């Protein structure tokens, strides 16, 4: 009986410790993720963030987005966007799950091939792009420092040669320092 009580107390202590390691003021996180867009492109991101309070996270990162667009008569071309992001997240901890609704600014550049895959000249130029995004992340904390993240994301680029509105979903890993 004494052994069962000790094991129960150890399990409770471990669960409390795991939860206490996530989301304290001054804590820093690093995350990477990858996924797809509704247009069939690929996205990836690397981010860092700092907890300003148990619920407020301020951070930044870099996002990559590559899409192949179809042109006329079976032709196609690739477009790439590199975007820096500044984001604010509101963290809601639910035991091992953390809900992270967030939003922020996107600033970066977009580039496109000069020639299509069939050799046709394209009318697009490399340019500076900017916009906004909203993300509704969920993470599952599986150890003191590691979490798996799922990030559905909506982004709106105000100045772009291509699609202004993109919907994407990505999965990744987050490390809590």
At which residue positions do the language-model features occur?
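Transmembrane beta-strand segments of Gram-negative outer membrane beta-barrel proteins
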Residues: 22-36
């Amino acid at each position: 009986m004494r052994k069962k009580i000790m094991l129960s107390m150890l399990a409770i202590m471990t669960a409390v410790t795991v939860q206490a390691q996530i989301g304290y003021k001054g804590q820093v996180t690093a995350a990477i993720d990858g996924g797809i867009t509704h247009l069939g492109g690929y996205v990836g991101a690397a981010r860092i963030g700092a907890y300003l309070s148990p619920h407020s996270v301020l951070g930044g990162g870099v996002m990559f987005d590559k899409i192949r667009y179809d042109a006329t008569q079976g032709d196609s071309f690739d477009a790439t966007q590199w975007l820096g992001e500044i984001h604010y997240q509101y963290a809601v901890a639910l035991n091992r799950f953390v809900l992270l609704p967030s939003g922020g600014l996107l600033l970066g550049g977009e580039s496109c091939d000069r020639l299509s895959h069939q050799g046709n000249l394209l009318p697009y130029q490399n340019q500076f792009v900017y916009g906004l995004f909203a993300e509704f992340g969920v993470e599952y904390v599986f150890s003191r420092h590691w979490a798996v993240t799922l990030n559905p994301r909506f982004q709106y680029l105000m100045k772009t040669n291509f699609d202004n509105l993109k919907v994407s979903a990505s999965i990744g890993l987050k490390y809590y320092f």
